[in-house]
């Protein structure tokens, strides 16, 4: 493994006084050299002041304090960076061994701590920015076509794209700049893949489907398999209804491992931009998932349902077909959504109802044996 020796004094001057745009470029260059990789032999240190400049934060404490790694606030060690975004964890701040703590500026703390604090508007989001840099260093973008792989004649492969071994690229496929197609991936005929999209190993994209820019599809995701469409004939034999539509995944969508999105019977199954789907999610044919929706593991949405934007579906939520849900809804774990929802809000239970009413109902159900016993006693007295 090649190690890169960096003159720390030159780096400090360059980084500390450079404009923010140049800082981003320099960090990108560092990631390309893989000097930031956690498992590398060459570990780069950053001061609290440098991190604050990058994130637009304000330093309290020793601005020259150095960090070269990341840890949780409970278990962090000297030389590590951590973050605090929720006041309920404030009790860890006086005792943490972390050298630097990113803290949401709205959290009130007047106590003492050995850590240097960087106050930012949103510590979780700021930590995300830093983790993005580390992630690019740990798993940098690749280029080139590995063999054996199959690319259909006439498919144009951008110079900065990567196609892993045993990948299959069908006819008339359009690949955007910087796409990353990992080994054992299947891309059917007439598929479009947008710029900088990542398809991890084992992703399957059926014919005529489209994936936008800056998307991430994790291992085993299946896009465009036939929707579950059948019709019994006069003899009650299930006859298949051909699914001739497609799937459209818009920009900045992330799809978890082993999630399946069925192709439309006619038209398109659509996942709107910035939606995030967890592992093991099932999306039926002709469904529309709204912009910036969160779908947690084992959510299932039946065919032709339209989901509004900015909604959250907790684990194992089931949604019936041919219904409409508005924007800004939250459905608690294991809820069963059996009909149209008219207004935004929090819903729970099966069938899903207003979450507050559901909590009252649960309390009533829990007390039902006692209530029945009291009613029986009253009945006996009246006889």
Where are these regions (language model features)?
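Terminal amphipathic alpha-helical/low-complexity segments used for targeting or macromolecular assembly
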Residues: 2-4, 8-12, 24-148, 160, ...
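Serine/threonine-rich, low-complexity intrinsically disordered segments
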Residues: 4, 8, 12-18, 187, ...
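Structural signal for interior beta-strand "rungs" in well-ordered beta-sheet cores
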Residues: 83, 144-354
């Amino acid at each position: 493994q090649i190690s890169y020796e960096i003159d720390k004094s030159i780096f400090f001057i360059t980084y500390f006084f450079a404009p923010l745009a140049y800082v981003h470029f320099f960090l990108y260059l560092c990631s390309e050299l893989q000097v930031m990789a956690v498992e590398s032999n060459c570990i780069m240190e950053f001061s609290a002041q440098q991190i604050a400049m990058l994130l637009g934060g304000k330093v309290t404490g020793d601005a020259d304090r150095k960090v070269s790694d990341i840890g949780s606030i409970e278990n962090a060690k000297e030389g590590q960076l951590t973050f605090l975004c929720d006041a309920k964890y404030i009790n860890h701040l006086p005792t943490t061994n972390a050298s630097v703590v990113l803290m949401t500026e709205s959290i009130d703390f007047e106590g003492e701590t050995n850590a240097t604090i960087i106050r930012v508007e949103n510590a979780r989001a700021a930590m995300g920015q830093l983790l993005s840099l580390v992630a690019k260093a740990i798993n940098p973008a690749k280029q080139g076509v590995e063999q054996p792989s199959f690319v259909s004649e006439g498919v144009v492969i951008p110079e900065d794209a990567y196609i892993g071994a045993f990948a299959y690229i069908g006819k008339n496929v359009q690949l955007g700049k910087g796409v990353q197609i990992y080994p054992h991936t299947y891309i059917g005929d007439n598929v479009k893949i947008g710029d900088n999209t990542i398809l991890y190993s084992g992703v399957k994209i059926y014919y005529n489907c489209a994936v936008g820019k800056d998307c991430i599809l994790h291992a085993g995701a299946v896009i465009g398999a036939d929707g579950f469409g059948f019709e019994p004939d006069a003899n009650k034999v299930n006859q298949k209804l051909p699914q001739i539509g497609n799937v459209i995944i818009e920009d900045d969508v992330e799809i978890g491992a082993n999630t399946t999105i069925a192709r439309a019977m006619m038209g398109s199954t659509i996942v709107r931009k910035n939606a995030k789907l967890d592992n093991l999610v099932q999306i039926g044919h002709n469904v529309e998932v709204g912009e910036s929706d969160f779908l947690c593991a084992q959510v299932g949405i039946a065919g032709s349902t339209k989901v509004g934007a900015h909604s959250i579906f907790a684990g194992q939520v089931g949604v019936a077909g041919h219904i409409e849900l508005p924007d800004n809804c939250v459905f608690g774990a294991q809820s069963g959504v059996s009909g149209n929802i008219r207004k935004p809000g929090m819903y729970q239970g099966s069938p899903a109802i207003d979450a507050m009413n559901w909590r009252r109902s649960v309390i009533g159900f829990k007390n039902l044996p006692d209530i029945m016993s009291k009613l029986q006693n009253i009945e006996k007295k009246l006889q």
